[in-house]
Amino acid sequence: MMDSNVVINALMAMPAWESIAALLGVAYIILAAKESKWCWPFAFANTLIYTVLFWEGQLPMQALLNLYYMGMAIYGYILWRKHVDNESDILITSWSYSKQILFLLVGTILSLVTAYFLEKTAISQSPYLDASVTIFSIMNTWLLARKILQNWMYWIIIDSAAIMLYIQTEYYATAALFVLYTILAFVGAINWQKRFNQQKS
Protein backbone atom coordinates (compact mmCIF):
# COMPACT_ATOMS: atom_id res chain seq x y z
CA MET A 1 0.00 0.00 0.00
CA MET A 2 1.32 3.46 -0.89
CA ASP A 3 2.39 5.51 2.16
CA SER A 4 1.08 9.11 2.19
CA ASN A 5 4.56 10.36 3.14
CA VAL A 6 5.98 8.69 0.03
CA VAL A 7 3.46 10.56 -2.13
CA ILE A 8 4.22 13.91 -0.45
CA ASN A 9 7.97 13.42 -0.77
CA ALA A 10 7.58 12.41 -4.42
CA LEU A 11 5.53 15.52 -5.16
CA MET A 12 8.16 17.72 -3.48
CA ALA A 13 10.88 16.05 -5.57
CA MET A 14 9.11 16.47 -8.91
CA PRO A 15 11.39 18.04 -11.57
CA ALA A 16 10.39 21.52 -12.73
CA TRP A 17 9.10 20.38 -16.13
CA GLU A 18 7.04 17.57 -14.59
CA SER A 19 5.54 20.06 -12.15
CA ILE A 20 4.63 22.43 -15.00
CA ALA A 21 3.09 19.56 -16.98
CA ALA A 22 1.06 18.49 -13.96
CA LEU A 23 -0.33 22.00 -13.41
CA LEU A 24 -1.20 22.30 -17.11
CA GLY A 25 -2.98 18.95 -16.87
CA VAL A 26 -5.07 20.11 -13.92
CA ALA A 27 -6.03 23.29 -15.81
CA TYR A 28 -6.99 21.19 -18.83
CA ILE A 29 -9.31 18.83 -16.98
CA ILE A 30 -11.01 21.67 -15.05
CA LEU A 31 -11.67 23.63 -18.25
CA ALA A 32 -12.82 20.49 -20.07
CA ALA A 33 -15.33 19.81 -17.30
CA LYS A 34 -16.67 23.34 -17.89
CA GLU A 35 -16.85 22.73 -21.66
CA SER A 36 -14.36 25.55 -22.34
CA LYS A 37 -12.50 25.45 -25.67
CA TRP A 38 -9.44 26.77 -23.82
CA CYS A 39 -8.93 23.35 -22.26
CA TRP A 40 -7.26 22.23 -25.50
CA PRO A 41 -4.26 24.64 -25.54
CA PHE A 42 -3.50 23.55 -21.97
CA ALA A 43 -3.81 19.93 -23.08
CA PHE A 44 -1.39 20.53 -25.97
CA ALA A 45 1.26 22.11 -23.74
CA ASN A 46 0.81 19.43 -21.07
CA THR A 47 1.19 16.54 -23.50
CA LEU A 48 4.11 18.14 -25.34
CA ILE A 49 6.09 18.18 -22.12
CA TYR A 50 5.03 14.66 -21.12
CA THR A 51 5.92 13.30 -24.57
CA VAL A 52 9.51 14.44 -24.08
CA LEU A 53 9.68 13.36 -20.43
CA PHE A 54 8.31 9.86 -21.04
CA TRP A 55 10.51 9.35 -24.11
CA GLU A 56 13.62 10.32 -22.17
CA GLY A 57 12.42 8.11 -19.31
CA GLN A 58 12.21 5.09 -21.66
CA LEU A 59 8.43 4.79 -21.52
CA PRO A 60 7.68 4.63 -25.26
CA MET A 61 3.98 3.70 -24.94
CA GLN A 62 3.28 6.64 -22.65
CA ALA A 63 5.27 8.93 -24.96
CA LEU A 64 3.24 7.68 -27.93
CA LEU A 65 0.01 8.22 -26.01
CA ASN A 66 0.92 11.82 -25.24
CA LEU A 67 1.96 12.41 -28.85
CA TYR A 68 -1.53 11.30 -29.84
CA TYR A 69 -2.99 13.61 -27.19
CA MET A 70 -1.19 16.52 -28.85
CA GLY A 71 -2.93 15.80 -32.14
CA MET A 72 -6.29 15.41 -30.42
CA ALA A 73 -5.76 18.73 -28.62
CA ILE A 74 -5.48 20.47 -32.00
CA TYR A 75 -8.52 18.58 -33.31
CA GLY A 76 -10.58 19.34 -30.22
CA TYR A 77 -9.73 23.04 -30.26
CA ILE A 78 -10.59 23.45 -33.95
CA LEU A 79 -13.84 21.54 -33.50
CA TRP A 80 -14.98 23.43 -30.40
CA ARG A 81 -13.88 26.85 -31.75
CA LYS A 82 -15.74 26.24 -35.00
CA HIS A 83 -18.99 25.88 -33.12
CA VAL A 84 -18.25 28.93 -30.94
CA ASP A 85 -17.56 31.05 -34.04
CA ASN A 86 -20.85 29.86 -35.52
CA GLU A 87 -22.56 30.75 -32.22
CA SER A 88 -23.66 27.16 -31.78
CA ASP A 89 -22.57 24.64 -29.19
CA ILE A 90 -21.59 21.06 -29.82
CA LEU A 91 -24.41 19.27 -28.07
CA ILE A 92 -23.59 16.63 -25.49
CA THR A 93 -24.84 13.30 -26.77
CA SER A 94 -25.35 9.97 -25.02
CA TRP A 95 -24.30 6.68 -26.58
CA SER A 96 -26.63 3.70 -26.77
CA TYR A 97 -25.71 0.52 -24.89
CA SER A 98 -24.82 -1.18 -28.18
CA LYS A 99 -22.27 1.54 -29.02
CA GLN A 100 -20.78 1.32 -25.54
CA ILE A 101 -20.46 -2.47 -25.78
CA LEU A 102 -18.76 -2.12 -29.17
CA PHE A 103 -16.43 0.53 -27.73
CA LEU A 104 -15.44 -1.76 -24.85
CA LEU A 105 -15.06 -4.79 -27.12
CA VAL A 106 -12.80 -3.03 -29.62
CA GLY A 107 -10.77 -1.47 -26.81
CA THR A 108 -10.30 -4.82 -25.08
CA ILE A 109 -9.19 -6.60 -28.26
CA LEU A 110 -6.71 -3.83 -29.15
CA SER A 111 -5.42 -3.81 -25.57
CA LEU A 112 -4.78 -7.58 -25.60
CA VAL A 113 -2.99 -7.41 -28.95
CA THR A 114 -0.84 -4.50 -27.78
CA ALA A 115 -0.11 -6.18 -24.45
CA TYR A 116 1.01 -9.34 -26.25
CA PHE A 117 3.47 -7.26 -28.29
CA LEU A 118 4.74 -5.46 -25.19
CA GLU A 119 5.17 -8.76 -23.35
CA LYS A 120 7.10 -10.37 -26.21
CA THR A 121 9.40 -7.38 -26.67
CA ALA A 122 9.79 -6.80 -22.91
CA ILE A 123 9.62 -3.02 -23.29
CA SER A 124 7.03 -2.49 -20.56
CA GLN A 125 7.14 -3.28 -16.85
CA SER A 126 3.38 -3.90 -16.79
CA PRO A 127 2.33 -4.81 -20.35
CA TYR A 128 -1.39 -5.51 -19.86
CA LEU A 129 -2.09 -2.52 -17.64
CA ASP A 130 0.12 -0.27 -19.78
CA ALA A 131 -1.63 -1.39 -22.97
CA SER A 132 -5.14 -1.02 -21.55
CA VAL A 133 -4.52 2.48 -20.21
CA THR A 134 -2.95 3.56 -23.51
CA ILE A 135 -5.56 2.09 -25.86
CA PHE A 136 -8.63 3.20 -23.91
CA SER A 137 -7.13 6.67 -23.34
CA ILE A 138 -6.60 7.06 -27.09
CA MET A 139 -10.16 5.98 -27.83
CA ASN A 140 -11.76 7.96 -25.02
CA THR A 141 -10.08 11.25 -25.95
CA TRP A 142 -12.05 11.13 -29.20
CA LEU A 143 -15.26 10.72 -27.17
CA LEU A 144 -14.36 13.80 -25.14
CA ALA A 145 -13.70 15.85 -28.28
CA ARG A 146 -17.10 14.78 -29.68
CA LYS A 147 -18.79 15.51 -26.32
CA ILE A 148 -20.04 11.98 -25.72
CA LEU A 149 -21.56 11.95 -22.22
CA GLN A 150 -20.08 8.61 -21.18
CA ASN A 151 -16.47 9.77 -21.67
CA TRP A 152 -16.24 10.89 -18.04
CA MET A 153 -17.36 7.50 -16.72
CA TYR A 154 -14.65 5.90 -18.83
CA TRP A 155 -12.06 8.42 -17.62
CA ILE A 156 -12.82 7.46 -14.02
CA ILE A 157 -12.04 3.83 -14.86
CA ILE A 158 -9.02 4.64 -17.05
CA ASP A 159 -7.51 7.07 -14.53
CA SER A 160 -8.00 4.53 -11.72
CA ALA A 161 -6.13 1.94 -13.80
CA ALA A 162 -3.42 4.52 -14.53
CA ILE A 163 -2.98 5.08 -10.79
CA MET A 164 -2.26 1.35 -10.35
CA LEU A 165 0.14 1.44 -13.32
CA TYR A 166 2.15 4.35 -11.95
CA ILE A 167 2.26 2.86 -8.45
CA GLN A 168 3.53 -0.44 -9.86
CA THR A 169 6.23 1.39 -11.83
CA GLU A 170 7.01 3.67 -8.84
CA TYR A 171 5.90 6.91 -10.48
CA TYR A 172 4.29 8.01 -7.24
CA ALA A 173 4.01 11.71 -8.12
CA THR A 174 2.19 10.96 -11.35
CA ALA A 175 -0.02 8.46 -9.50
CA ALA A 176 -0.98 11.23 -7.07
CA LEU A 177 -1.78 13.52 -10.01
CA PHE A 178 -4.09 10.87 -11.45
CA VAL A 179 -5.92 10.63 -8.14
CA LEU A 180 -6.82 14.29 -8.71
CA TYR A 181 -7.73 13.52 -12.34
CA THR A 182 -10.13 10.83 -11.11
CA ILE A 183 -11.83 13.23 -8.71
CA LEU A 184 -12.13 15.88 -11.43
CA ALA A 185 -13.57 13.26 -13.78
CA PHE A 186 -16.41 12.78 -11.27
CA VAL A 187 -16.96 16.55 -11.36
CA GLY A 188 -16.97 16.50 -15.15
CA ALA A 189 -19.50 13.67 -15.19
CA ILE A 190 -21.85 15.58 -12.88
CA ASN A 191 -21.55 18.85 -14.83
CA TRP A 192 -22.09 17.21 -18.22
CA GLN A 193 -25.05 15.20 -16.94
CA LYS A 194 -26.69 18.44 -15.78
CA ARG A 195 -26.06 20.07 -19.17
CA PHE A 196 -27.37 17.00 -20.97
CA ASN A 197 -30.57 17.07 -18.92
CA GLN A 198 -30.98 20.79 -19.69
CA GLN A 199 -30.63 20.08 -23.41
CA LYS A 200 -33.49 17.59 -23.26
CA SER A 201 -35.82 19.95 -21.37
Model-identified regions with their sequence ranges:
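Polytopic alpha-helical membrane-helix bundles and their juxtamembrane interface segments
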Residues: 2-35, 39, 83-87, 91-153, ...
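Generic alpha-helical scaffold signal
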Residues: 20, 39-45, 61
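Hydrophobic alpha-helical transmembrane segments of multi-pass membrane proteins
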Residues: 42-56, 70-72
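Amphipathic alpha-helical packing elements
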Residues: 49-53, 59-63, 163-164
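Individual alpha-helical transmembrane segments in multi-pass integral membrane proteins
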Residues: 59-72, 178
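Short, flexible micro-motifs
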Residues: 61, 79, 173
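Membrane-water interface of transmembrane alpha-helices
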Residues: 67-84
